[in-house]
A protein has these predicted regions:
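Aromatic-rich peripheral "rim/lid" segments of glycoside hydrolase catalytic domains that contact
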Residues: 42-45, 164-179, 303-320, 324-367
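Noncatalytic carbohydrate-binding groove/subsite architecture in carbohydrate-active enzymes
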Residues: 90, 182-315, 347-359, 366
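Short, acidic/polar
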Residues: 39-54, 126-136, 232-249, 318-325
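Hydrophobic faces of well-ordered beta-strands that scaffold small-molecule active sites
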Residues: 32-36, 62-64, 87-91, 145-149, ...
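Boundary/entry segment of secreted carbohydrate-active catalytic domains
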Residues: 25-65, 340
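N-terminal secretory signal peptides that target proteins for export/translocation
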Residues: 1-6
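Substrate-binding cleft and catalytic face of glycoside hydrolase catalytic domains
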Residues: 50, 54-224, 301-303
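Bacterial N-terminal signal peptides
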Residues: 8-19
Length: 367
């Protein structure tokens, strides 16, 4: 997402129409979701048009940031609520505004942005700054289906505790699924402080007038081959390893689900895609026991930008992934699913192209 957008163009590293029953008050909207994380940077007219197009396409839920410019992003949340779309709101920890009064960024390189280390996170500063934003969200009557605490905190693009390495390297010996970690102590400290901040989110949610039923989802963790992370020169920690650390720090007591990301590749074999997906969902609940996973990003690349969009390779893989997700929804292993992306960069993944909904988008949203 954004800082990691170049990865989407290379790596095979979000909601859909699901013909599956969903228990309790959980709406089917969160199975017909899509990412549109840049709404706060659009003009009011652009936001209105984008959201109207989404509604007409059959989108049920939108994953959108809460970050600078905060007033514009809250305006976007307000408009989504008034237009009847459900919301998965991401609370970002990669930028200083919610992290600490004196937070500093780790330098970036190229498309890997300069971001704040999670180890700098001051939970009480977060309580103060997020609390003001939350009160405005409540005052406006904005309704949230879920709150995602952070994004891709297990690699260098979104967590400054993870460093940049010489590109085109190789994963170090003895670290399957991960790359480097020159300062593991800082990474572990950052994850502990992250869990403390999520506990504060839960306190606000539990005291809410409008959003007491909103689910709290842990940061969507990226899944990528360690060889690719080494190639681009970025420290990366395996998603399951990171989740195990977070759970040991008390994550399960403060979240309702685990965020995960998945980008299946057209050039992979079916057995490879099945194996990767099962590995991704290893921590997810089976039969409603434990926490389900929320697929807060998944997407399929279509790199030919000519109009009309050539969907011949993408549509079969999207159908395959929709079926795979639906099977896991029925088992209650997946609690929500959001396609990446509606119409923003990287455009190779978007489903709104050439002025309309692509064939891939029609498959996703049942049109």
């Amino acid at each position: 997402m954004r800082a990691a957008s170049f990865v989407r163009c290379v790596v095979a590293v979000c909601v859909i129409v699901m013909q599956a029953s969903v228990s309790g008050a959980q709406s089917l909207d969160v199975y017909r979701g899509v990412n549109e994380t840049q709404l706060g940077w659009k003009t009011p007219e652009e936001r209105e048009k984008i959201i109207d197009n989404m509604r007409q396409a059959g989108v049920g839920s939108v994953r959108v940031d809460l970050r600078e410019p905060f007033d514009k992003y809250i305006d976007s949340l307000d408009l989504l609520t008034r237009k009847g779309l459900s919301i998965l709101m991401i609370v970002q920890f990669a930028e200083p505004q919610l992290v600490a009064r004196d937070a500093t960024r780790r330098p970036g390189r190229g498309s890997i942005w300069s971001v704040v280390p999670l180890s700098q996170l001051d939970p009480e500063f977060f309580r103060e700054k997020f609390g003001g934003l939350w009160r405005e969200i409540e005052r406006r009557g904005i309704r949230l289906a879920a709150i995602e605490a952070g994004n891709e905190i297990n690699w260098a693009a979104f967590n400054g505790d993870l460093g940049l390495l010489p590109p085109q390297g190789q994963p170090p010996q003895g670290a399957p699924g991960s790359v480097a970690l020159h300062d593991r102590a800082a990474y572990l400290l950052g994850l502990r402080r992250y869990v403390a901040a999520v506990a504060i989110l839960k306190q606000f949610r539990d005291a809410s007038v409008n959003n007491r039923d909103a689910k709290i989802i842990s940061a969507g963790l990226t899944w990528m081959p360690a060889t690719f992370a080494a190639y681009v020169g970025a420290e990366y920690v395996d998603s399951n390893e990171t989740l195990d650390i977070l759970k040991a720090d008390g994550l399960d007591a403060v979240v309702d689900g685990y965020g995960v990301h998945f980008y299946p590749g057209v050039n992979q074999t079916l057995s490879q895609r099945n194996r990767d997906f099962e590995d991704l969902l290893r921590p997810c609940a089976v039969g409603g026991r434990g926490h389900s996973c929320w697929l807060t990003e998944w997407g399929v690349r279509q790199p030919n930008l000519a109009c009309p969009s050539d969907e011949s390779k993408r549509v079969p893989l999207i159908r395959e992934t929709v079926d795979r997700i639906a099977a896991n929804v029925r088992q209650k292993r997946i609690g929500g699913s959001y396609y990446y992306d509606w119409d923003d960069n990287p455009i190779e993944f978007t489903v709104w192209r050439c002025g309309g909904l692509t064939e891939a988008g029609k498959v996703l949203f049942g049109r």
